[in-house]
Amino acid sequence: MKLTASANHTLDALLELVCVELQLTETQDGKSRGHYGAVADWLSREGSPLRGFDPHIFPQGSQRLGTTTKPIGKSEFDLDAVCKLTASQDWHPGELYQLLWDRLYANGLYRPMMKRMPRCIRLEYAGDFHLDIAPAIPDPACGGNCILVPDLNADLALEHPANNVWKSTNPQDYADYISSFFY
């Protein structure tokens, strides 16, 4: 069925309204970038136990792709970040996770916002969004931008280390690949 120009224009306008409602506003995007920067500063500043591992914080997933949308039935956006450290694979996943947890917990602002998740630590910001931060190390088996993230039951990570493993992933190259189709 072929649409008239008027009907096509109406559908385009409707889709644009839906997209605007689902994505971060410019203000929210600016706030999220500010939070990424503040977390990165806290993790890498002088006195941080992570500083010696050269922490690099970067967005991943929809935030990296610029396609962030509010999940259906949720009032907040789900933003994802990686905290890549130069630590070796000799680290146990639970130890690395705990190191990141302890550093975030040392900040009185972040402490009440923190929640343990299987592969990340969630900071629940009031209202607009939460930020999931996954600790990571380089994946020597894959090279390039590949990283290893903990795949663990966060509550049992240190008590039952045999149940926790590293999971290989490559969010940077994945985002670049997807972006190559659109930009």
Q: Which residues does each PLM region occupy?
A:
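N-terminal regions immediately upstream of nucleotidyltransferase
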Residues: M1-E76, S88-E95, C120-L123
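Conserved catalytic core of two-metal-ion nucleotidyltransferases
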Residues: L43-P49, Y97-D155, E159-A162, W166-T169, ...
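Glycine- and aspartate-rich repeat motifs characteristic of hemolysin/RTX-like Ca2+-binding segments
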Residues: D80
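Short beta-strand-to-loop capping motifs
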Residues: C83-A87
